[in-house]
A protein has these predicted regions:
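Conserved catalytic-core segment of nucleotide-activated headgroup transferases in glycan assembly
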Residues: 23, 146-149, 155-207, 211-221
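Short hydrophobic beta-strand element within catalytic cores of glycosyltransferases
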Residues: 255-259
Length: 324
């Protein structure tokens, strides 16, 4: 099977620094392992070309490589460009036009299918009309971690290593960082706590607790993975739409601690975790640290599994969008 990818080709994992880049790189690797041939086409450039010209260029590229699908790994890509691009491609391309997003977009996105990381089926069980639209134009493929990067490492000391997630991007949103950092002062065992800030990956000073902002400054995936591979505990600090890093930490053997209502239920159920209150019970945490068990629980969440679910869709007939 041939697939046309909208976006940049990443040659090495060391080039990956963002969520979209992670999808682009890891999906490409998984597709290649499955025997899929990938061709790449540039993203739309507003002000440089018209939507009509871009559609023609994409269709020409798709025809030239006999593509069965056009896939944009960039998060909800076709909703970030003029709507007519996606709609024209859906109408004129015989194969699937697809994108990736956190959750269901019902039939609002100008694509044939949105592959979702989160399973939103439960949201529409009491609304048959919306449930039909959800099932027709969305498919849950789940989440994954690159097991070449995120895997169990043997510990060489008895230091409890804790990774505290970065503070919320939006400082006006609710964030548990300060309370969690203050809880570190109650630990009575040797430990090291690390976090992610605008200055990169840093060690937390328990004698000088402060919440340092993080505004999405890119950190190489290789560097971040090396940090998580050392962690016994990963602490969520704020509500997450996905919580992908939670899976990556669990792949490395970390026990996940989270305040209530910070992770989607289907995400949380897949990892060994504790829901914490304002006062963390460190005795219970330490008793539940089991790196081998934590890693074993999430081993099935691979990029190959996600690629396989997408390919299952691409070999079927795509649905009609009618006049949408």
């Amino acid at each position: 099977m041939n697939i046309l990818i909208i976006g940049r080709k990443f040659e090495a994992i060391s080039d990956v620094k963002t969520y979209t880049e992670m999808w682009a790189y890891n999906l490409a690797c998984a597709f290649s392992e499955a025997g899929v041939t990938l061709q790449y086409h540039r993203p739309y450039s507003p002000g440089v070309e018209s939507p009509e010209d871009y559609v023609e260029a994409v269709l020409t590229a798709a025809t030239a490589c006999s593509a069965k699908a056009i896939l944009a790994p960039g998060l909800r890509y076709f909703t970030t460009v003029p709507r007519e691009i996606g709609m024209q491609l859906c109408r004129r391309f015989s194969g699937w036009v697809a994108q990736v997003y956190d959750g269901s977009m019902l039939d609002s996105a100008p694509v044939d299918i949105t592959f979702t990381v989160r399973d939103d089926t439960w949201r529409y069980l009491d609304n048959p009309g919306r449930l039909e639209r959800h099932n027709r134009f969305n498919k849950h493929v789940g989440w994954a971690a690159n097991q070449d990067l995120f895997h169990l490492e043997t510990k060489t000391d008895d230091v409890l290593r804790i990774f505290v997630d970065h503070a919320a991007f939006d400082v006006s949103g609710f964030d548990h960082s300060l309370s969690i950092l203050m809880n570190l002062q109650r630990l009575t065992v040797p430990y090291e706590a690390r976090t992610l800030t605008d200055d990169g990956l840093v060690t937390i000073d328990p004698g000088n607790i402060s919440v340092i902002p993080y505004r999405r400054t890119p950190v190489p995936a290789t560097e971040f993975a090396a940090e998580l591979r050392k962690s016994d505990v990963f602490i969520v600090t704020h509500p997450e739409s996905l919580g992908l890093t939670v899976l990556e930490a669990a792949m490395c053997g970390a026990l996940v601690l989270t305040p209530p209502d910070c992770l989607p239920p289907d995400r949380l159920a897949l990892v060994n975790h504790m829901v914490i209150k304002s006062r963390i019970d460190w005795d219970e945490v330490i008793a539940r640290v089991d790196r081998v068990k934590n890693a074993e629980k999430v081993q099935c969440h691979t990029w190959s599994a996600i690629a396989e679910k997408m390919l299952e869709t691409f070999v079927t007939q795509k649905p009609s969008r009618g006049n949408g």
